[in-house]
Amino acid sequence: YPSIINILPSVNKFGGAGKNFYRLIKDVDLENYDYICFSDQDDIWYKDKIKNAIDCLVFNNANCYSSNVIAYYPSGQKNLVDKAQSQTQFDYFFEAAGPGCTYVIKKETLIEFKKFIINNKNAAQDICLHDWFLYSFARTRNYSWYIDRKPTMLYRQHENNQVGANISFKAKYKRLGLVRNKWYQKEVTKIANALADDSFVNNQLGKGYIGNLILALSFWKLRRKKADKIYILLMLILNIF
């Protein structure tokens, strides 16, 4: 369908989903579309996924949309991945708005993000997770974001998932490793620095254990899920973050 499908020329391998999506956002002409959806090749969308997302955007007068998903495994196991807890003051520094493959963004918002990553090429390319970065960009620029409790797709889990659903013990152990080796802290810091956000969180980053303790005083503002609020509190107090 050459009239509706535009295939971009092949370029060098980028080595991760983030840089691939940054390339797509920069190279695709967004002006002819009202909404832009991110997609992974190995997930299964529900038939009403896009309609449901646009209906939610219109009804809630929001700029950006994401949703819960159903993680599914080669064994046939399925689990709800719930990311639709209430947004907090600073959650965007510490997590995405759900899997990026559920994102549906109004054209005007993504065009602004496109301008940002073009004008801040080095900083943007250094941030691993495009979906987390886009959520942070939107929140710091006061674009409204709606996270839907309704699952809109099957989110396939396999060994090559860059992040994954974080449900199994193995997945949680892998995430803990990313915290302990400071990958997580570095990504938070890179996002805060790239966005030049002069917030409470950014002002504590890089201040060592004292900064962690100050962040711990506002731990309930840093994540959405109750359990994750406790996890980050412990990470800060124990100086694992």
Describe each region flagged by the PLM.
Residues 1-169:
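Nucleotide-sugar donor-binding/catalytic module of glycosyltransferases
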Residues 116-123, 154-241:
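C-terminal subregions of glycosyltransferases and related glycan-biosynthesis enzymes
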